[in-house]
Amino acid sequence: PARAAAGRASASRIPRERPVAAFVMDVYPVTNGQYLEFVRVHPEWRRSRVKALFADASYLRHWRGDLEPGDRAPADSPVVYVSWFAARAYLRSHGRRLPTVDEWEYAAAASETERDASRDARFLGRIRDWYGRPTPEPIPPVGSGLRNVYGVGDLHGLIWEWTLDFNSALVTGESRGDASLERNLYCGSGAVGAADFENYAAFMRYAFRSSLEARYSVGNLGFRGVLAGPETAR
C-alpha cells in the first residue's frame, strides 16, 4: 500500500476546502486473480449464486465461469463487472474498505511529480485523452500506467473505480454550463475539482458516479482498497 499524508481537498475557484485525514491506499486495483481467490472462499459471491439484490445481471459477465475467469479476464488485469456491494464485501474480508470520494480524488489529483496537479494542463490532458478512448478487451494488467508521487498506480488510464460514497454526487443540470449542475457537483459531492469546468475530467467522474446504483456491474468499473478509519457510508 501507499500512504497519502493528511491534506486538504480543494474545489477549484470556490474558496472552500475539505480536510482529508492521512490514509493508506492500495497501490493497484484489485485483479481478477485476487477476486478469484475471494469467490473460492466466499461462494455466495460467485456469478451463479450472487443475489440479485447485490449485483445485476452483468456481474462478472466476462468470466468464463464461476471459478474460471478465462481469456477475457487475465489474472493480472483489474477485475471489472463487480458491484459496489461485491467490492465492499471483498475489501471487508481483507480488513480494508473503499476510499471515499474525497480520498480517491485527493490521491488522483497527484501526478508523477506533484501532489496537486489539478492545474497542470498536460496532466489533465492525458486524463481527458484516456476518457475519450474505448476500454480495450482484455483490459491491460495493473501496473501498465504511471505511479503518482505517492506511489499509487493506475488511478487513471485503466478503469474507473468505485468509491464508498459514490452516490453523494447528484447531477441534475441539463447542460455542461448549467448553474444548478455546478452547484450540485460541488455542494452535493463535496470533493475535489468538479466545480471547475476547466477540469472536465473531474466533471466526467462526478457525472459517471451520479449515474450508478450500488448493484450495477460495469465493464470498465473496478475498485481498490484503503486503510483508514471506520466505514461510514450506508
Residue ranges of model-derived segments:
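Short, solvent-exposed loop/turn elements at domain surfaces
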Residues: 1-9, 32-37, 46-47, 194-200, ...
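Disulfide-stabilized, aromatic/cysteine-rich ligand-recognition loop
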Residues: 21, 77-78, 82-85, 96, ...
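Short, well-ordered junction/capping motifs at the entry into regular secondary structure
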Residues: 73, 128-156, 210
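Chymotrypsin/trypsin-fold serine protease catalytic domain
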Residues: 113-139, 183
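Acidic glycine-/aspartate-rich tracts in secreted/extracellular proteins
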Residues: 165-167, 230-231
